[in-house]
Amino acid sequence: MAAAVELTGDGGTTAETRWLSPPLTHDDNRGFLQMLREKKERLGVGAAKVEVRLEKLTVEADVRVGRRAVPTLLNCAINAAQELAACAHMCTTRKKPMKIINEATGTIRPSRMTLLLGAPGSGKTTLLKALAGKLDSSLKMKGKVTYNGEEVNSSTPQYLHAYVSQYDLHHAEMTVRETIDFSSKMLGTNNEFEMLGEAIRRKKGVINRVDQELDSFIKATTFGEGSNLTTNYIIKILGLSECADTLVGDEMRRGISGGQKKRATIGEMLVGLARCFFMDDISTGLDSSTTFEIMKFLQQMAHLMDLTMVISLLQPPPETLELFDDIILLCEGQIVYHGPRENATDFFETMGFKCPSRKNVADFLQEVTSKMDQKQYWIGNANKYQYHSIEKFAESFRTSYLPRLVENDHFESTNAGKSKEVKTSTSRMISSWNIFKACFSREVLLLKRNSPVHIFKTIQITVLALVISTLFLRTNMRHDTVLDANKYMGALFMAVVIVNFNGMTEIAMTIKRLPIFYKQREILALPGWALLSSVFLLSLPISFVETGLWTGLTYYVIGYAPSFVRFIQHFVVLFAMHQMSMSLYRFLAAIGRTQVMANMLGTAALIAIYILGGFVISKDNLQPWLRWGYWTSPFTYAQNAVALNEFLDDRWATEFHFANANTVGETILKVRGLLTEWHWYWICVSILFGFSLVFNILSIFALQYMRSPHKHQVNINATKVKVDYNSQIVGNGTASTDQVILPFQPLSLVFDHINYFVDMPKEMTKYGVTDKKLQLLQDVSGAFRPGVLTALMGITGAGKTTLLDVLAGRKTGGYIEGTVKIAGYPKKQETFSRISGYCEQSDIHSPNLTVYESLQFSAWLRLPSNVKSHQRNMFIDEVMDLVELTGLKNAMVGLAGATGLSAEQRKRLTIAVELVASPSIIFMDEPTTGLDARAAAIVMRTVRKTVDTGRTVVCTIHQPSIEIFESFDELLLMKRGGQLIYSGSLGPLSSNMIKYFEAIPGVPRIKEGQNPAAWMLDISSRTAEYEIGVDYAEIYQRSSLYWENRQLIDDLGKPEPNTEDLHFPPKYWQDFRAQCMACLWKQNCAYWKNSEHNVVRFINTFAVSIMFGIVFWKIGSTIKDEQDVFNILGVVYGSALFLGFMNCSILQPVVGMERVVLYREKAAGMYSTMAYAIAQVAVELPYMFVQVFIFSAIVYPMIGFQMTATKFFWFALYMVLSFLYYTLYGMMTVALTPNIEIAAGLSFLIFIFWNVFSGFIIGRQMIPVWWRWVYWANPAAWTVYGLMFSQLGDRTELIQVPGQPEQTVKEFLEGYLGLQDRYFNLVTSLHVAIIALFTFLFFLSIKHLKFQRR
């Protein structure tokens, strides 16, 4: 459907209707849907209503509980061993079954809107996914879900049901309109519209003007012009018109707000107009008025289009609750109530629990089953009260009249309902061609929007081409001897290597988009082949440009065979290699699925195809039983093809007899173990294209069938599995008898005439805006006092968070005017961070710590040094009890939205992290967002108790219930544009605030029982202000309230007599040594539990070590000719470069993730960044030493180096130094760059330089003088030098060199490779120097560079 200023499709059809003209009101929408319904009835068109039934639905998961669930390295090893033993039927896995949904039975009727209520962790998401047929395959499901009697399964038509996730995953590069439009194309046209369209085609004559408008709309929607029309309608009803053409954005791109992203997530599925909708916590991030608007539109659609809707909301306000027809109350997986909304309170009243008159019914329903809250609603004799368990409620419901009431009142009789079977409509099925077109057009769009990435790659390959072409410049390139051919061989190999490396960027690009693909695969049925084929087709011109650029810049400059045919054939090989490379790394990303795993697989694959490709060690020197590996490496075919193309040219036909060859060209091919016949060129090229085809096919299967690696999961306690009701009483907020009282100083905060500006966005100039600055806060003044809880409220865009950031000193940009005083003295940020806490909305924590460890770390560094450790631990326990985290003490924090704590648990942890610092002033940004009513009440009780201790607390809050709103003492209300419109006390039952606004002429009076917060936000909206014809900011500045506040500001802005300004002698509570110890303790805890990172690198090190040992088996024991030296040089080269680079690449995501936490902790004044940096470096050392031990212990004896203590020591030492500088280099690049993608790109670019100038591809003696300085600036070259000379520098065996007399190994090293004894000590010293330099740069950049923008 469509509704906008103009409902215009791609084909130019326009349907401007009087009932869809902007703005789209509820009456407009109802009128449109009503006329559409009447039209269907006249034409006899209509889709079957869908009744959804649950029949004893049980969903179970096998989980590990207790400490064994914590993913430490030891637990991972034990768990893996148990899994293997269980597979061999030697033991059980010791997992425990946990029921997520327990025998849920019920009927969800069509043409009605059902509200699903329940606390986070109650099983709401699992139930909704079960209803939508989207359950994860790892879960065990019993019972069944049916649509009109037919069981839901994978063959159920996609258009029948839609699941809206609670997580907002979108392409940052697409606009809101493009995002919803793509979903529309993938979901297809609504079946009813198809039938209507067919009826209209057959209809003769025109009934009236309204029919004409409906007909034109339906035709446009049905016959290929309707995607924009459908999209526009959804955009309109969701209130997204203002941002429809704005990029969604992410942490790197400015985009829409969190609330707008949530609405885009809803629109993404709503646009398909399925028959059943299952929506999961869709009000998170939305204010109450926006939530009401959206729910009202959804109600009209459910009633007038006969849809079946089940929607879960966290904190539905009363006016929103009244829009629902039915309620399902889910507690710990059991349905406690399912029936009409109006009967819900009656049911609980029959059990002795009554909802108070001013209590939100939704809040009552969620609290009445809680052991902590239940007693307050008991209406019987207080002495006879006993806790009613969830099982008792559920059993009472099952035996009540309500289930039978629902059964008797469903939409049709059972027989009639079953006759309307749900059948797949072939006309609704989207053709493969249309799916491909939609995907391809989106990929073209993303390619354009990501053009900076491809421009960067083009610049990168241009720079590398210029380097390589000047390194192998034709004026220095001869073609008379085998040594000359060796130099050309190095240039050819380098071309293959760089083209292959260029394809590695596919890993990061693919990993970045996989979470969105998994979501769209699940909810849009996006097939893997559609995405992969689109990406593949668009990769062809990319390969053409990049390999064409490389070939054009290097071929004739280096001086390869001058024939144009040879030039084209050289290009074809590199093009095929580039395609193979992109396909390979795309495939590895698809099976790795996480950045760490994909980087590991990519590096392992690179090492394997590199080592087995025939250049590092020739085919003839491989063990006979390993030569099959040579033919499995794509490098083999690329290297053979480019070598054949070059060395079979006539200019290499100089007569030369060696190794059964007659020319120089044939000799180099024979010596290198390469093919010598021309027909192999085309075979090799064909095989490269074959590799590409195979990897693309495998990628399709991986995308289609592999599960998402981060399915949302929460921590499971053993108590939950046993359903221990006593666990619910933990954390009831009551003070313990041995309460620890930590001293703090009550402080007031005054801010006067605060103005905040940012530079005007460039996009605004397009609309004629000439101002250079955009003002976000306008002359805001106020005061926050000890013992007073203040609410900072306003509609979206009013500047609430901006004001908090300015007052807390968290803004990193913009221009601030005005004064801020603490206890009458000007605010100093250094001291303010010591006495304040800031609970950010984003809940940023280290994912690999437990809850208790997170609190220990915060308290360790933020409490005064004179607080003893036992006092600190007791205080932490009290805070955990206060915010109900005691039961989650040993739970992993995890990644937000993926693993670990749920959203509300993370929110409580955020508050606890600040409370353990015992601050005097606390700022809280949206502390109840994402929480259900009960969790929000717990949080606000915690806040209230904090205020009652004499602290100053300010909260921004979105959509508070009556109870939560009236727990505040004072209110600061702002309107859009950053202007203050009310500042003062709320009064009993919000009477002061209500009295103030009702005194303004034109303001509608509050309705009886209406939430004062919702009423206040409604009347203060821009639309309401315009309709009334007032400016609230002007009215406030003329009011007596304003002058009362001015007097308060003046009074609090003066210091109290006999007081001094805050002063803390040291900059931090703890000294530098304690900071280092605390940071190292935290990093050690996090690393020990980061099993993915550490297990991956240990396994990879072991696998690579075994591969090196097998491939280079005993090559160091005997040296007979030049090729034997090159083979040893190959293993040294591989040891010096690849494992170190693997460490660098898999470390970067870990450091990048912790850097975000660093910004929060640094802003809180917890520690010096130097302490953080030292801990980050130090924690890597033991894990790195283990890697070096594994590698050295395996590789050294297997490759046959001389077994002397001295030589083994030098080998191990250089490996330690190599690992160390690679590790530090990875950290340094993260600290120097704003994100991991740029850090990875920079690392790759530098790694190529290190690779080229390492002394393997071209020896130091052969490097042109203008590039020789790079060799001496290259740490990888030093490692190759040190390893090679320490092992072979004293070898005196005579070896054969083609075209030269016999010479000793030492003479060959000095003459050809430039390895001399006099430089050995220098090389060792340079290792220490580069490690010190990288460490210094890491410390410096982490201290002074901050890429967070607020």
Curated annotation (Swiss-Prot):
<feature type="domain" description="ABC transporter 1">
    <location>
        <begin position="85"/>
        <end position="357"/>
    </location>
</feature>
<feature type="transmembrane region" description="Helical">
    <location>
        <begin position="683"/>
        <end position="703"/>
    </location>
</feature>
<dbReference type="GO" id="GO:0016887">
    <property type="term" value="F:ATP hydrolysis activity"/>
</dbReference>
<keyword id="KW-0472">Membrane</keyword>
<feature type="transmembrane region" description="Helical">
    <location>
        <begin position="1322"/>
        <end position="1342"/>
    </location>
</feature>
<feature type="transmembrane region" description="Helical">
    <location>
        <begin position="1126"/>
        <end position="1146"/>
    </location>
</feature>
<feature type="transmembrane region" description="Helical">
    <location>
        <begin position="1269"/>
        <end position="1289"/>
    </location>
</feature>
<feature type="transmembrane region" description="Helical">
    <location>
        <begin position="453"/>
        <end position="473"/>
    </location>
</feature>
<keyword id="KW-0812">Transmembrane</keyword>
<keyword id="KW-0677">Repeat</keyword>
<keyword id="KW-0067">ATP-binding</keyword>
<feature type="transmembrane region" description="Helical">
    <location>
        <begin position="1208"/>
        <end position="1228"/>
    </location>
</feature>
<dbReference type="InterPro" id="IPR034003">
    <property type="entry name" value="ABCG_PDR_2"/>
</dbReference>
<feature type="binding site">
    <location>
        <begin position="118"/>
        <end position="125"/>
    </location>
    <ligand>
        <name>ATP 1</name>
    </ligand>
</feature>
<feature type="transmembrane region" description="Helical">
    <location>
        <begin position="1099"/>
        <end position="1119"/>
    </location>
</feature>
<dbReference type="InterPro" id="IPR043926">
    <property type="entry name" value="ABCG_dom"/>
</dbReference>
<dbReference type="InterPro" id="IPR013525">
    <property type="entry name" value="ABC2_TM"/>
</dbReference>
<feature type="transmembrane region" description="Helical">
    <location>
        <begin position="1181"/>
        <end position="1201"/>
    </location>
</feature>
<feature type="domain" description="ABC transmembrane type-2 1">
    <location>
        <begin position="434"/>
        <end position="647"/>
    </location>
</feature>
<feature type="transmembrane region" description="Helical">
    <location>
        <begin position="491"/>
        <end position="511"/>
    </location>
</feature>
<keyword id="KW-1133">Transmembrane helix</keyword>
<feature type="transmembrane region" description="Helical">
    <location>
        <begin position="557"/>
        <end position="577"/>
    </location>
</feature>
<dbReference type="GO" id="GO:0005524">
    <property type="term" value="F:ATP binding"/>
</dbReference>
<dbReference type="Pfam" id="PF19055">
    <property type="entry name" value="ABC2_membrane_7"/>
</dbReference>
<feature type="region of interest" description="Disordered">
    <location>
        <begin position="1"/>
        <end position="23"/>
    </location>
</feature>
<dbReference type="GO" id="GO:0016020">
    <property type="term" value="C:membrane"/>
</dbReference>
<dbReference type="InterPro" id="IPR013581">
    <property type="entry name" value="PDR_assoc"/>
</dbReference>
<comment type="function">
    <text>May be a general defense protein.</text>
</comment>
<dbReference type="Pfam" id="PF08370">
    <property type="entry name" value="PDR_assoc"/>
</dbReference>
<dbReference type="InterPro" id="IPR017871">
    <property type="entry name" value="ABC_transporter-like_CS"/>
</dbReference>
<protein>
    <recommendedName>
        <fullName>ABC transporter G family member 45</fullName>
    </recommendedName>
</protein>
<feature type="binding site">
    <location>
        <begin position="794"/>
        <end position="801"/>
    </location>
    <ligand>
        <name>ATP 2</name>
    </ligand>
</feature>
<feature type="domain" description="ABC transporter 2">
    <location>
        <begin position="749"/>
        <end position="1001"/>
    </location>
</feature>
<dbReference type="InterPro" id="IPR003593">
    <property type="entry name" value="AAA+_ATPase"/>
</dbReference>
<dbReference type="InterPro" id="IPR027417">
    <property type="entry name" value="P-loop_NTPase"/>
</dbReference>
<comment type="similarity">
    <text>Belongs to the ABC transporter superfamily. ABCG family. PDR (TC 3.A.1.205) subfamily.</text>
</comment>
<dbReference type="Pfam" id="PF00005">
    <property type="entry name" value="ABC_tran"/>
</dbReference>
<feature type="transmembrane region" description="Helical">
    <location>
        <begin position="1238"/>
        <end position="1258"/>
    </location>
</feature>
<dbReference type="GO" id="GO:0140359">
    <property type="term" value="F:ABC-type transporter activity"/>
</dbReference>
<feature type="transmembrane region" description="Helical">
    <location>
        <begin position="597"/>
        <end position="617"/>
    </location>
</feature>
<keyword id="KW-0813">Transport</keyword>
<dbReference type="Pfam" id="PF01061">
    <property type="entry name" value="ABC2_membrane"/>
</dbReference>
